[in-house]
Amino acid sequence: MEQYEKVEKIGEGTYGVVYKARDRVTNETIALKKIRLEQEDEGVPSTAIREISLLKEMQHGNIVRLQDVVHSEKRLYLVFEYLDLDLKKHMDSCPEFSQDPRLVKMFLYQILRGIAYCHSHRVLHRDLKPQNLLIDRRTNALKLADFGLARAFGIPVRTFTHEVVTLWYRAPEILLGSRHYSTPVDVWSVGCIFAEMVNQRPLFPGDSEIDELFKIFRVMGTPNEETWPGVTSLPDFKSAFPKWPAKELAAVVPNLDASGLDLLDKMLRLDPSKRITARNALQHEYFKDIGFVP
């Protein structure tokens, strides 16, 4: 750990404290994540070390690069490139952002590019949200942070500071207790983020798992065996769920053009087997006029 000098604490993530730090060897500024593990007395599980080591191989312009993994005194520190702006901060500080469809499109394209890369390496994110989409102020390049950490460490219900981990971007199959979910969970999250960029407010801001599900069903319709074969067999599906009809997406996201609505509709299919893949989303007509993307 001698190589890294902490400069200041910059936040508290899902897994532990995040510091702005300096690499004493290269003098570059980095982000240092101290991972707080549940079973701290036992040290770091070897499975977590293996998972994290694989992530060092992931290199792509839309992924925050994991530069180093330091295992010291039963603690795990992850060293990432440093970016100080995230999509949530950007949306909060620039409400006019949603009025710029080109920028929304450019950010969405980069999110999908990063995800398609990860999925092609069989890595899921599972916890995508505006807070872990980082933006380079100079270039408007967008990079996904915390990819693969969920598999290494699990997703806690609360962070180590007892903040509730957000459910707003969680896919319906996870909320319904499916154990066999896959890459479509990330595409669902991206759909929610897409709508939020356009509407300037979260699409499904639930405050509990059941509230989250019902907020989804009120817009997308309550699923049944016809619309989602197998849904009634999921562990947390209840036949007593209210049966809401689906709304028109155009009424829910009124500022989005027809091709944008078509893409959003394909990302927000309740049945994960019918959801568009990240790779196919990049080929969608919505992006035909995309031009240069950082």
From Swiss-Prot:
UniProt activity-regulation remark: Phosphorylation at Thr-14 or Tyr-15 inactivates the enzyme, while phosphorylation at Thr-161 activates it.
Keyword set, alphabetical order: ATP-binding, Cell cycle, Cell division, Kinase, Mitosis, Nucleotide-binding, Phosphoprotein, Serine/threonine-protein kinase, Transferase
Name assigned to this protein: Cell division control protein 2 homolog A
GO BP terms: cell division; G1/S transition of mitotic cell cycle; regulation of G2/M transition of mitotic cell cycle; regulation of meiotic cell cycle; signal transduction
GO cellular component: cyclin-dependent protein kinase holoenzyme complex; cytoplasm; nucleus
Catalyzed chemical reaction(s): L-seryl-[protein] + ATP = O-phospho-L-seryl-[protein] + ADP + H(+); L-threonyl-[protein] + ATP = O-phospho-L-threonyl-[protein] + ADP + H(+); [DNA-directed RNA polymerase] + ATP = phospho-[DNA-directed RNA polymerase] + ADP + H(+)
Active site: 127 (proton acceptor)
EC number(s) stated in the UniProt entry for this protein: 2.7.11.22, 2.7.11.23
Organism listed in the record: Antirrhinum majus
Annotated positions of the Phosphotyrosine modification: 15
Residues bearing the modification Phosphothreonine: 14, 161
Annotated binding of ATP, by residue: 10-18, 33
One GO MF term: cyclin-dependent protein serine/threonine kinase activity
Highest taxon listed in the record's lineage: Eukaryota
Role played: Plays a key role in the control of the eukaryotic cell cycle.
Gene name of this polypeptide: CDC2A
Family the entry assigns: Belongs to the protein kinase superfamily. CMGC Ser/Thr protein kinase family. CDC2/CDKX subfamily.
Pfam family, one: Pkinase
Domain Protein kinase: 4-287
